[in-house]
Amino acid sequence: MGSIYRSEHMKLCQIFFQSESAYQCVAELGELGMAQFIDLNEEQNAYTRKFVNEVRRCDEMERKINFVEDEITKDLVPIPDYDEHIPAPQPKHMGEMEANLEKLEEELVQINKNCKVLKNNHVQLLEMKAVLEHVTSLLDPHSKREAAMSISEAARGEAGPISFGMKDEFDKPVKDEKELKFVTGVVKRSKAIAFERFLWRLSRAKVFAKFIQIQEQTELFSNEFEDKCVFILFFSGEQLRAKVKKICDGFQAKCYTVPENPAERTKLLLNIKVQTTDMKAVIEKTLDYRSKCIHAAATNLRKWGIMLLKLKSIFHTLNMFSVDVTQKCLIAECWVPEADIGQVKNSLHMGTIHSGSTVPAILNEMETDKYPPTYFKLNKFTQGFQNIVDAYGIANYREVNPAPWTIISFPFLFAVMFGDAGHGIIMLIAASAFVIFEKKLISMKIKDEIFNTFFGGRYVVLLMGMFAIYTGFIYNDFYSKSVNIFGSSWVNPYNQTLLANMDAQGADSNTDLSLTFPPEIAFNHDYGPYPFGVDPVWNLAINRLNFLNPMKMKTSILLGISQMAFGIMLSLMNHIGNRSVVDIVFVFIPQCLFLGCIFVYLCLQVLMKWIFFYVKPAYIFGRLYPGSNCAPSLLIGLINMFMVKSRDASFAHDVGTAAGKEWVIVNGQNVTYTINDQCYLQQWYPNQSLVELILLLIAVVSVPVMLLVKPFYIRWRHSRGLHIDLGHGPDEHGEFNFGDIMVHQAIHTIEFVLGCVSHTASYLRLWALSLAHAQLSDVLWTMVLRMSLTMGGWGGSAAITILFYFIFSILSVCILILMEGLSAFLHAIRLHWVEFQSKFYGGTGIQFEPFCFTKIIRVYEGLDQ
């Protein structure tokens, strides 16, 4: 039985279906979602498979549903979600579904066609009505006289300074207004000017045009409309009429024939108005009927879509099965979690019953050397953390899963970099809202990708907020300020008189005087360590970074090496699971020795320095420690360890003798000594040089052991004909090649050795990002909020304070929570993917992707990818 620590045991199963029960059995397996089918017809193309015709019919129905959905979307009709369970339709119902969808499609197509014709006719009637209403004013005697004069002037060459060159057949003056011909119509207002200019130039000013804008909208049943103009064009001669008509067609201007007799125009206008009213009523009834069809279709669209989705996915799955020679039996192969084989058998039994078949489906477990897929049973809490791991790579089959450890380590390392209790509270509140209202938010089926990213990781953000509050109190950082909960271990050794004198001196010299708190008199040594976190007095100190930076830097190293060491420990679980003794003895143990002899030793030095080396003189490990100036330098000490550099055996010599040049009080006694040169670089515990030499030799010897022993051991087993587990992944071949094995082992050895150094340095980002966040928070507080709080006067100060607080809040959320939070999030991901998981995690497995209706429907609804 598997767990979240290791993937589930998988079984390759072979299932024999009767042809009449195969569809229903696959439908039941789709509802269960615990079987990943293997395509047994990979060599066949999609057009030669057994159920290709059914798939094509499903594709055609899908096209019709998409067409209906497009029509619904055009009308801005909401499509309600269908939350009730919909069983997979029976194959015998496909004909009914096809008929219903075909009828609906034909009906909508015919309605759209009729609507288009009716709307065009209605537009033409409205345009004709507008022409008839305005043409009377355009055909008055004054307009005709003006047109005749303009055309005659153009014919005589008096139209203006432009020379048209040679004369043509149109260059005849108009002798009588009765010779004038005219064309009326409608053109878009945006084209009117170009239309008029083109007519003027092409006819050489022999066409006189007048325009009147239509005030009434001519496209009542369209969301898109343009302003239009009624035009009338005066000219003489039938040849020019043909040319004018072509120009009108080119500018998409519609021409309408208008009687010259006013009485006939009036009669025609009345007739047009009646037709317009009738046409409008017909269109409204047609659109009303279309709206009813659209609303009825919208109600059932999601239901039809889900039914078709299940139908099509079942036939796609059936196409993956092989057919026996009798054509009466289908054979399938699938991966099934071993713990769920009973449920799969029960689903097959239910499918057989529902299909009415008398022959049950038979499931056989197969022995195979195929690489199984990886499957973890997850819940809504663990899913987010597993997604972080899977984004790097899917775990190998039965490999140790990093996700359980990531649940704690990921938000904690994020919080070490984020480290602000105030911002952590905001993050916690936001994540809590997602968790509290998660059922309501899930039911809303929000498809926004950014929202779903945050909502899917709501429990990750929740723990990130909790740990940010915890580390914020450890750093005693609340919006860049400290909180005085337990008081302070430091006391002010200066009296009021001295402080007043120092203020006066500072004012006289126009300088800021700083006070120094000597630990001997200003620190309460009897108080002991601060109960929790950092003493709040450090927030007031000028040298607070000199104190906080080394603390955070060393803490980062401790956390980093601890996590890397834990990763190596997890690799032991993989070796035990693989029953690989050679990996345990000649890979795991040398890795532990290499990491321990150098980096764990460094961590022990950090802890010992914190515990033993204080500001007061003392005897430490039998050696006189004169004071903080002799506190050992760990970095240079580590370098000296690799260089095997000789060092003095203690911090001082001539201790307790008359030759001592200096003295200190240790345990109430005066002790004389002579301090050694660069005392902070000398040995600080007995036989330190010997111990470090031994550790260095062990670390150096571990490297060739990691590099050489395993490849030659595998070669020895191969030469003896013994079984060799090459540990190949799903995409690799199992042929023995000593050169490949040697190169592979060399890469892993070099990666581990160099990685121990580079990864340790990489963990310093925990300190760097914490410092950056603290400094940004301090700048924001100083430059925005404190500025408003220190403003004098009462007039408008409250409004200014509110304004600055609003700005402070917006910048805090946008910069310090979102931007800095995203930065810390990405760095935490890097530390887990590279520094932690590289010690034990392969990440080259195959994701278990069962045939599951729930997953398919979520992808169809746009909720999953």
Swiss-Prot record:
GO cellular component: apical part of cell; apical plasma membrane; plasma membrane; vacuolar proton-transporting V-type ATPase complex; vacuolar proton-transporting V-type ATPase, V0 domain
One GO MF term attached to the UniProt entry: ATPase binding
InterPro entries documented for this protein: V-ATPase_116kDa_su (IPR002490), V-type_ATPase_116kDa_su_euka (IPR026028)
Cytoplasmic membrane side: 1-409, 475-556, 605-623, 710-798
UniProt entry keywords in alphabetical sequence: Cell membrane, Coiled coil, Glycoprotein, Hydrogen ion transport, Ion transport, Membrane, Transmembrane, Transmembrane helix, Transport
Major site of localization recorded for this protein: membrane
UniProt cross-references to Pfam families, sorted A to Z: V_ATPase_I
Coiled-coil zones: 51-121
Entry's Gene Ontology BP terms: nematode larval development; vacuolar acidification
Bilayer topology term: Multi-pass membrane protein
Record note on disruption phenotype: RNAi-mediated knockdown causes larval lethality at the L1 stage. RNAi-mediated knockdown at the L1 larval stage causes reduced growth rate. The progeny of the few that reach adulthood is arrested at the L1 larval stage. Rhythmic defecation behavior is altered; the defecation cycle period is extended and animals have a slight arrhythmia. In the intestinal epithelium, pH oscillates once per cycle as in the wild-type, but the oscillations are diminished in amplitude and cells are relatively acidic. Also, luminal pH oscillations are reduced.
Extracellular-side segments: 431-453, 578-583, 645-688, 820-865
Glycosylation sites: N578, N670, N687
Domain of life (superkingdom): Eukaryota
Compartment annotation: Apical cell membrane
Transmembrane segments: 410-430, 454-474, 557-577, 584-604, 624-644, 689-709, 799-819
Assembly notes: V-ATPase is a heteromultimeric enzyme made up of two complexes: the ATP-hydrolytic V1 complex and the proton translocation V0 complex. The V1 complex consists of three catalytic AB heterodimers that form a heterohexamer, three peripheral stalks each consisting of EG heterodimers, one central rotor including subunits D and F, and the regulatory subunits C and H. The proton translocation complex V0 consists of the proton transport subunit a, a ring of proteolipid subunits c9c'', rotary subunit d, subunits e and f, and the accessory subunits vah-19/Ac45 and vah-20/PRR.
Its biological purpose: Subunit of the V0 complex of vacuolar(H+)-ATPase (V-ATPase), a multisubunit enzyme composed of a peripheral complex (V1) that hydrolyzes ATP and a membrane integral complex (V0) that translocates protons. V-ATPase is responsible for acidifying and maintaining the pH of intracellular compartments and in some cell types, is targeted to the plasma membrane, where it is responsible for acidifying the extracellular environment. In the intestine, required for the rhythmic defecation behavior by promoting acidification in the gut lumen following defecation.
PANTHER family assigned: V-TYPE PROTON ATPASE 116 KDA SUBUNIT A 3, VACUOLAR PROTON ATPASES
Family note: Belongs to the V-ATPase 116 kDa subunit family.
Protein name: V-type proton ATPase 116 kDa subunit a 3
Species, as recorded: Caenorhabditis elegans
Organism taxonomic ancestry: Eukaryota, Metazoa, Ecdysozoa, Nematoda, Chromadorea
Gene name of this polypeptide: vha-6
